[in-house]
Amino acid sequence: NPAFEVKAGTGTDRYTSKMETPQTYAFVGFFAEMPYTAKNRLLASVSAQILSKRLLDKVREEMGATYSISASGQMSRLGKLNTTFQTAFPMKPEMKDEVLAAIKELTTTMKENVTEAELKPVVEFMVKQTGEDLKDNSSWAGAMAASTLNGVTTFINNNEILGTITVTDVQKFISDVLAQNNYRVIVLDPDGDVQEAAK
């Protein structure tokens, strides 16, 4: 149903609302139409976990702009823009422009500067998680049901595929996603009166 599709294109939408505690809430997402394969599905998750660590290190630890921040990445078997990366978080209103610029930079530079030190712990974690999922009946049931939607098996051979993923794979995947120019930002600010009162 097109009504439930992600809005394509690049842009920023801004809104305001009265708040007792002035904070800026932001959503950053980028989307793409990518071939649904077992490897691409894993690359979406791997890439998002690397981006999450970057966001945590930069936006929380270095900038001190928010208490918590992370990113998610996933592929859907259905829909046109089937690949989604997103992060949503509150932050200090006075830092919003700086933070949003940092997120854009951290994201776009993944096209060229992902390191083995970033990739290795993510792959190790996912291999461990897959091993646990293989022992769980509900994981098997979900995987079998999902494969009927498009015939792509994405469960049994996960660990084998994870072992083949390289830094270059991650960089190319992010590059291909960003090349489709669907990078959207939504900002909810405190309205003027509340923001002034907080100064």
How does the language model describe each region?
Residues Q171-D189:
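Bilobed periplasmic-binding protein-like "clamshell/Venus-flytrap" ligand-binding domains
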Residues Q23-P35, R60-E112, E116-T164, R184-D189, ...:
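M16 family metallopeptidases and their MPP-like homologs
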Residues D57:
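Long, His/Glu/Asp-enriched segments that create or flank divalent metal/ion-associated functional microenvironments
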